[in-house]
């Protein structure tokens, strides 16, 4: 299954989340994940609205009490790392915040780790980012593509005063991605800001292909509505779930990625765990370490990462910063995976998600999600091995 995001009328985090919920992601589970990151802070509420004749879902992120809207990247990372949420959701959210921090750091000329988030550090933006990451984990598309992004034009008031559209952080985030002004037909009036840093960062983190709808069999169309009902065009984002035909349909999870590698023989071995984590946070799809023997019999390691093209520079920066290497090799690879879906089983009142992999319509593999196993083990006061043993027979065969 593929996902195409239509951002030709702009994109914001809450609009994209509304579209994904309309396409089939479960709001209740998303609320649980957001609650685990920022407990008691926000309530998510989906409302069906109409924008210039187009129905859609307006996702409301409602504060439960007063909040401090300014947070450093380190604080947000701590919230995510300590949260008991699916690992994929956690790593994707960390990656999105890292992209925004890198863009903001470049704009303000400071280290991304020292970035003091304003609007993006607010509770609603954290909920948007975590919510979208969880929604995409639930829908589990093998391919994610997106249209050119409508940016808008004119000037807006922000935390740093009156600034032009696109705002500086958005201008950094869209580098290398097709854009358009989003001007209304038969009008030259400024339309203001159509794309927010949160919305753009989510597309840049997830989408590996740009352009119009890739074609295929459309299964679901989710519509996410913005707050304003502006004249002349529906203020919406579309999330289109589709199946491809022919060879790709038998296994849609085939992606072209970039593999980065470096040989390192003088790294403190205690630092390797942090190296792998930094690569994943920077946007790597996967990262690993391989022991090797170099010339003159020197023991060393090869550190490797699989990366979407949009995250190559960020991951290279993280690799240089976290290791002693002076060079990185890179080349394109094609990764083929199984078509995936999730089913649920109960173990002593605790839900365990089972990831099932299939190819050409035949189930090949079924494995329980480890985060669910760990949560159940803690709640029941038993070992993770015992939880696995209690899963109904045949579920993981």
Swiss-Prot record:
Short name of any one Pfam family annotated for the protein: Ni_insertion
One example of a Gene Ontology biological process annotation: protein maturation
Database matches in InterPro entries: Ni_insertion
MF terms in GO: lyase activity; nickel cation binding
EC number: 4.99.1.12
Catalytic activity: Ni(II)-pyridinium-3,5-bisthiocarboxylate mononucleotide = pyridinium-3,5-bisthiocarboxylate mononucleotide + Ni(2+)
Keywords for this protein: Lyase, Nickel
Family: Belongs to the LarC family.
Function as written in the Swiss-Prot or TrEMBL entry: Involved in the biosynthesis of a nickel-pincer cofactor ((SCS)Ni(II) pincer complex). Binds Ni(2+), and functions in nickel delivery to pyridinium-3,5-bisthiocarboxylic acid mononucleotide (P2TMN), to form the mature cofactor. Is thus probably required for the activation of nickel-pincer cofactor-dependent enzymes.
Protein name: Pyridinium-3,5-bisthiocarboxylic acid mononucleotide nickel insertion protein
The species this protein was found in: Corynebacterium glutamicum (strain R)
Gene of this entry: larC
């Amino acid at each position: 299954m593929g996902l195409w995001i239509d951002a030709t009328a702009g994109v914001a985090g809450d609009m994209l989340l509304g579209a994904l919920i309309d396409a089939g992601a479960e709001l209740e589970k998303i609320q649980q994940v957001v609650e685990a990151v920022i407990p008691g802070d926000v309530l998510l509420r989906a409302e069906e609205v109409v924008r210039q004749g187009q129905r859609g879902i307006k996702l409301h992120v409602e504060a439960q009490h007063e909040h401090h809207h300014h947070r450093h990247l380190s604080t947000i990372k701590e919230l995510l790392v300590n949260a008991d949420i699916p690992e994929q959701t956690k790593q994707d959210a960390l990656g999105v915040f890292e992209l925004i921090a890198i863009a903001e750091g470049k704009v303000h000329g400071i280290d991304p780790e020292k970035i003091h988030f304003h609007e993006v550090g607010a509770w609603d933006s954290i909920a948007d980012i975590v919510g979208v990451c969880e929604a995409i984990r639930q829908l589990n598309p093998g391919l994610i593509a997106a249209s050119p992004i409508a940016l808008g034009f004119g000037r807006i008031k922000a935390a740093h005063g009156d600034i032009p559209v696109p705002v500086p952080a958005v201008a950094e985030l869209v580098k290398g991605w097709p854009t358009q002004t989003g001007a209304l037909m038969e009008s030259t009036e400024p339309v203001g800001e159509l794309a927010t840093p949160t919305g753009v960062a989510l597309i840049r983190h997830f989408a590996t292909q740009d352009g119009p709808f890739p074609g295929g069999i459309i299964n679901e169309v989710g519509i996410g509505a913005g707050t304003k009902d502006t004249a002349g065009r529906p203020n919406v984002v579309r999330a289109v779930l589709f199946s491809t035909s022919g060879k790709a349909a038998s296994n849609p999870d085939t992606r072209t990625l970039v593999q980065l590698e470096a040989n390192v023989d003088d790294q403190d071995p205690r630092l390797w765990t942090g190296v792998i984590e930094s690569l994943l946070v920077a946007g790597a799809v996967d990262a690993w370490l391989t022991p090797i023997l170099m010339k003159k019999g020197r023991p060393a390691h090869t550190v490797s990462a699989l990366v979407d093209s949009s995250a190559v520079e960020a991951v290279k920066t993280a690799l240089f910063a976290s290791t002693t290497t002076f060079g990185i090799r890179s080349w394109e690879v094609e990764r083929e995976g199984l078509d995936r879906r999730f089913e649920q089983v109960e173990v002593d009142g605790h839900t365990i998600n089972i990831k099932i992999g299939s190819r050409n319509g035949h189930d090949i593999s079924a494995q329980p999600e480890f985060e669910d196993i760990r949560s159940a083990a803690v709640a029941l006061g038993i070992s993770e091995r015992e939880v696995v043993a209690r899963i109904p027979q045949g579920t993981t065969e």
